[in-house]
């Protein structure tokens, strides 16, 4: 993971950071998403290291293949849907603190994700924010 990029995200609706220092993954604060799977509501914590698929579930089951409804843990709004993944699940977007969007598939276990920038300067800001290890 030495050459990986650290992703810091915020809610695209309320603008509050989604980083949770109380739940660590890959030795870094996790990305905290509220989720609803079936009738259960809980949290999914994702690694902030781009390309790491480490995650932790709290209050909901870690069931491979299930589609997760994802919400901001602060304002409760659902994250915007951008398109449908090849696996037929919705792709949601989280706002990067440096600018731009990270899009992730909402199906547990699907590894489809991407970084998108409207302004190329936001991409440069993200890369410049990384230290020499790439982990900030």
Predicted regions and their residues:
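Short Cys/His-rich Zn2+-coordinating modules
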Residues: 49-59, 63-73, 86-92
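N-terminal alpha-helical interaction blocks
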Residues: 1-50, 134-135
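Short metal-binding segments enriched for Cys and/or His
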Residues: 36-61, 101-126
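Short metal-coordination and nucleic-acid-contact micro-motifs, chiefly zinc-binding Cys/His arrays
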Residues: 4-7, 65-68, 78-83, 99-106
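C-terminal engagement modules used by replication, chromatin/transcription, nuclear envelope/ESCRT
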Residues: 128-136
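Short functional micro-motifs and their immediate structural scaffolds
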Residues: 16-20, 77-80, 90-95, 110-115
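Short cysteine-rich clusters marking metal-coordination/redox-active sites
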Residues: 11-14, 72-75, 85, 105-107
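Short linker/helix segments within small regulatory modules
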Residues: 25-28, 62-66, 88-104
């Amino acid at each position: 993971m030495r050459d990986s990029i650290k992703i810091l995200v915020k809610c695209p609706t309320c603008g509050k950071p989604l980083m949770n220092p109380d739940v660590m993954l890959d030795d870094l604060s996790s990305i905290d998403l509220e989720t609803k799977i079936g009738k259960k509501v809980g949290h999914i914590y994702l690694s902030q290291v781009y390309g790491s698929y480490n995650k932790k579930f709290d209050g909901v089951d870690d069931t491979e293949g299930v589609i997760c409804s994802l919400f901001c843990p602060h304002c409760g709004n659902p994250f915007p849907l951008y398109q449908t993944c090849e696996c037929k699940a919705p792709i949601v977007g989280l706002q990067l603190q440096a600018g731009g969007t990270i899009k992730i598939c909402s199906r547990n276990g699907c590894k489809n994700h991407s970084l998108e920038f409207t302004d190329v300067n936001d991409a440069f800001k993200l890369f410049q924010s990384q230290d020499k290890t790439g982990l900030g």
